[in-house]
């Protein structure tokens, strides 16, 4: 299924990826990543089943937060990955087709079984309300092992030419590292950050971290930050990984153009919100 919605003169199309079209969609991505080296990413997963101690959370403790992340990611499974590829000017790929149609991707995974696997019920209900069909994912979704194999050869990772743009992405990267390594996350935060750099490079931008350094006071989740920056959602719904990956990219673009024209955002790269180790 392909969903689209007009954004000014362009129509943004979300390419839904299932098991049957996984390889052909990665073929498309492999062919364009050199020209569209900015990759914005979002994931959907079944919430968290291990909760943070609020007092520790307020004080900020990267090692504690990583241990909590590891406990949740090790126990849970990925539901969706959204990818938006762009060039430095913000142009999305047209894939050689109609010039007013631009494309982003949403990968649907089969790993999570809502009837069997641990999850946070309120998170599952939220995702259902926003259109995720867990039964279809189980029937037709992508196997994470095959996704990882194709990602390794896609040019998206282990590639010094690409930049990754995310929002509050420690969990997002946690799930990707888990499926890429096919094992539980490492015990030590520094080892996890080493794997993050090995796979995704040094140019990883977490908008939730970077917005601390903007002149305008920005706070809250992705939708609130986007509204503060006067960025509108171009396609899809919140809590859908493809749509959120595009909104993340557009918020980053606006933030970069407003606050980091002279003093670039590069010096804030490589740090994930909540896991700040300097």
Curated annotation (Swiss-Prot):
Described purpose of this protein according to its UniProt entry: Ubiquitous transcription factor required for a diverse set of processes. It is a component of the CCR4 complex involved in the control of gene expression.
Catalytic activity annotation: Exonucleolytic cleavage of poly(A) to 5'-AMP
Organism: Arabidopsis thaliana
Any single biological process term in GO: nuclear-transcribed mRNA poly(A) tail shortening
Lineage: Eukaryota, Viridiplantae, Streptophyta, Embryophyta, Tracheophyta
Localization per record: Nucleus; Cytoplasm
Quaternary structure, from the entry: Component of the CCR4-NOT complex, at least composed of CRR4 and CAF1 proteins.
GO-annotated molecular function: 3'-5' exonuclease activity; metal ion binding; poly(A)-specific ribonuclease activity; RNA binding
Domain of life: Eukaryota
Full protein name: Probable CCR4-associated factor 1 homolog 11
This protein's record includes keyword Chloroplast: no
First-tier enzyme category under EC: hydrolase
Keywords: Cytoplasm, Exonuclease, Hydrolase, Metal-binding, Nuclease, Nucleus, RNA-binding, Transcription, Transcription regulation
The protein's Enzyme Commission number: 3.1.13.4
Binding residue positions for a divalent metal cation: 42, 44, 172, 244
Family statement: Belongs to the CAF1 family.
One GO location term (cellular component): cytoplasm
């Amino acid at each position: 299924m392909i969903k689209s919605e007009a954004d000014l003169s362009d129509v943004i199309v979300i390419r839904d990826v299932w098991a049957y079209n996984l390889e052909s969609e990665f073929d498309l991505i492999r062919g364009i990543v050199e020209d569209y080296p900015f990759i914005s990413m979002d994931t959907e997963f079944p919430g968290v089943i291990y909760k943070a101690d609020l007092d520790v959370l307020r004080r900020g403790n990267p090692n504690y937060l990583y241990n909590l992340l590891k406990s949740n990611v090790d126990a849970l499974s990925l539901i969706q990955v959204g990818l938006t590829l762009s060039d430095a000017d913000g142009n999305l790929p047209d894939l050689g087709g109609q010039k007013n149609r631009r494309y982003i991707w949403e990968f649907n995974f089969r790993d999570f079984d809502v009837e069997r696997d641990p999850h946070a019920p309120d998170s599952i209900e939220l995702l259902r309300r926003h259109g995720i069909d867990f039964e279809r994912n189980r029937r037709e979704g992508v196997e994470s092992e095959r996704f990882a194999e194709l990602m390794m050869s896609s040019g998206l990772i282990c590639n010094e030419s690409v930049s990754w743009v995310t929002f509050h992405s420690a969990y997002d990267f946690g799930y990707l590292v888990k499926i890429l390594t096919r094992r539980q996350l490492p015990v030590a935060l520094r080892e996890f950050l080493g794997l993050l750099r090995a796979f995704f490079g040094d140019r990883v931008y977490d908008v939730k971290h970077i917005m601390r350094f903007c002149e305008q006071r920005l706070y809250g989740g992705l939708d609130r930050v986007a509204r503060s920056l006067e960025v509108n959602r171009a396609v899809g719904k919140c809590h859908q990984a493809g749509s959120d990956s595009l909104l993340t990219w557009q918020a980053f673009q606006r933030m970069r153009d407003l606050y980091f024209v002279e003093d670039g955002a590069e010096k804030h790269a490589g740090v994930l919100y909540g896991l700040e180790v300097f």
